[in-house]
Amino acid sequence: MTKNYIFITGGVVSSLGKGIAAASLGAVLEARNLKITIMKLDPYINVDPGTMSPIQHGEVFVTEDGAETDLDLGHYERFIRTKMTCLNNFTTGSIYSEVLKKERRGDYLGSTIQVIPHITNAIKDRIILCSKNSDIILVEIGGTVGDIESLPFLEAIRQLAVDIGRKNVIYIHLTLVPYIKTAGEIKTKPTQHSVKELLSIGIQPDILICRSQKTVPINERKKIALFCNVPVNAVISLKDVDSIYTIPKLLKDQKLDNYICEYFKLNVPQADLKEWEKVIYEEKNASKEIIIGIIGKYIKLPDAYKSVIEALKHAGLKNKIKVKIELINSQEIENKNFKLLQNLNGILIPGGFGDRGIIGKLLSVQYARENNIPYFGICLGMQIAIIEFAQNVIGIKEANSTEFDPQCKFPVIDLIKTKKNDIKDTRQGKKNNKSNFGGTMRLGSQPCKLIFNSLSRKLYKKDTIIERHRHRYEVNNFLLKKIEKNGLKIAGRSKKNNIVEIIEIFDHPWFIGCQFHPEFTSTPRDGHPLFIDFIKSAKKNKKNNFKIKVKNV
């Protein structure tokens, strides 16, 4: 089958939801038995998001093969079955880095290196490389049309239509159609100007997806079609919705998938969205509500915990209950402000870096452990649980992680042995030209062997699991025997190098910590066993209406 490409651009303003639109369209096309993959092209100069601030950029989504990517790839995996790889996301920085390496090697034979053709050719090569095993490749171009940063990407996708044939390319432009409340009108002018900007680059959009507070009426759609030179049935209205998982149905109801399949001359069955209809039904019919607290330090931007938040919601669907999420700054708990925790039915500490807010996290773990509140620790959250247990159950008050105190006397958490030479002295703030944080972690999918009588083994229903990782610190084995004698059990270790992967407290209603990131593999259709059981336990916690007596922690 001929490879077909759909390029998705955005106009007027940023943050319109190109990633959600691309993922939703991918879900509908996949439901027509088409093999789909989705790419994200980011116009920033960073090589990848791995060292970017979560408060600026949101979470870093880790793929199976260990690529640190844009959070939109998380949306892609939650909507379609295809797993993303390092090929599905690249940046301006990675393209320039690749071209400059080739120039240094002499690959260009002394040519003057320019944006056109060298940068644009590198972009096109990456897009084609990712398309090998797919029928349709959706490519989301980051940024907004008109931004200087996006120009090389836009030029590259313009050229691709010439290279592979215009009949094999669809350009979708996502644009804002604002509703002016005081006038009671929907305005089409911003969309017209955005398309004009795109035309000046040499790209005529085939489809317009119009984002608005309300459904864009047919008369306004006809007006947009006339001035933007697209068919009326290719002007799609995408209004604000309560749940992003309703969007595949919204697109199908407007026959967007039919238009695309007819354009590409694809003879495929109609989309079967029964799985998505089930998800929507579960959302609408969830009864009651539980409150889960996420204790972190990046709470100013909820997208910093995007996959965790979505995984909790997925687990709520499977338990037929609404999950209300409270993002709590761990620093606010450092003065023992436990009122922030008293109404929670479950406590989750996600991954993170650095020592800011650690005391608040330690107190939160102690509060959950001593008051029988379901606790879920992910990555750093597991390490914090071990430190807290060593300090307050075993009585080793100086127990700590070398991430927070490089000279600590009892390092229950330490750098992974293979990573100690990678980051040099960066953890102590001493940097030189060989120091590097980027790409120095244990990344991607790793196998883990589960202990037979553990809760984790019961939930996964298998002896060996494969989960994704992103860390450079591990549990130090030197105190583990003493820790296990006091009630905290090792429920799983990595097969390759015996790293502690899962911990449990058996005599607690629900207390699990994992070194990996299960949130990256949770989907609305399937959920994830750890999250599903965590929410089940939190639901039981509320049902039993435990009266918490705050202990002196």
Swiss-Prot record:
What do we know about how this protein assembles, alone or with others? Homotetramer.
Q: Which gene encodes it?
A: pyrG
Report the SUPFAM superfamilies cross-referenced here.
Class I glutamine amidotransferase-like, P-loop containing nucleoside triphosphate hydrolases
> What else does the entry mention about this protein?
CTPSs have evolved a hybrid strategy for distinguishing between UTP and CTP. The overlapping regions of the product feedback inhibitory and substrate sites recognize a common feature in both compounds, the triphosphate moiety. To differentiate isosteric substrate and product pyrimidine rings, an additional pocket far from the expected kinase/ligase catalytic site, specifically recognizes the cytosine and ribose portions of the product inhibitor.
Keywords from the UniProt entry: ATP-binding, Glutamine amidotransferase, Ligase, Magnesium, Metal-binding, Nucleotide-binding, Pyrimidine biosynthesis
Instruction: State the residue spans of region: Amidoligase domain.
Output: 1-266
Residues binding L-glutamine, per UniProt: G352, L380, G381, M382, Q383, E403, R472
Provide the binding site for UTP: S14, K187, T188, K189, P190, T191, Q192, K223
| InterPro entries according to UniProt | Class_I_gatase-like, CTP_synthase, CTP_synthase_N, GATASE, GATase1_CTP_Synthase, P-loop_NTPase
The GO biological-process annotations, alphabetized, read as:
'de novo' CTP biosynthetic process; pyrimidine nucleobase biosynthetic process
Against Pfam families, the record matches this protein to: CTP_synth_N, GATase
Note how its activity is modulated. Allosterically activated by GTP, when glutamine is the substrate; GTP has no effect on the reaction when ammonia is the substrate. The allosteric effector GTP functions by stabilizing the protein conformation that binds the tetrahedral intermediate(s) formed during glutamine hydrolysis. Inhibited by the product CTP, via allosteric rather than competitive inhibition.
Q: Name one GO molecular function term.
A: ATP binding
Catalysed reaction(s) here are: UTP + L-glutamine + ATP + H2O = CTP + L-glutamate + ADP + phosphate + 2 H(+); L-glutamine + H2O = L-glutamate + NH4(+); UTP + NH4(+) + ATP = CTP + ADP + phosphate + 2 H(+)
Annotated function: Catalyzes the ATP-dependent amination of UTP to CTP with either L-glutamine or ammonia as the source of nitrogen. Regulates intracellular CTP levels through interactions with the four ribonucleotide triphosphates.
What EC designation does it have? 6.3.4.2
Give residues annotated as binding Mg(2+): D72, E140
Binding residues for CTP: S14, D147, I148, E149, K187, T188, K189, P190, T191, Q192, K223
Name under which the protein is recorded? CTP synthase
Residues in the active site? C379 (nucleophile), H517, E519
**Pathway per the UniProt entry:** Pyrimidine metabolism; CTP biosynthesis via de novo pathway; CTP from UDP: step 2/2
Q: What region holds the Glutamine amidotransferase type-1 domain?
A: 291-544
Cellular component, GO annotation: cytosol
Would you identify the family this protein belongs to, as annotated? Belongs to the CTP synthase family.
Sorted alphabetically, which PANTHER family does this protein's record hold? CTP SYNTHASE, CTP SYNTHASE-RELATED
Presence of the UniProt keyword Ligase in the record: yes
Annotated ATP binding sites: S15, L16, G17, K18, G19, I20, D72, K239, D240, V241
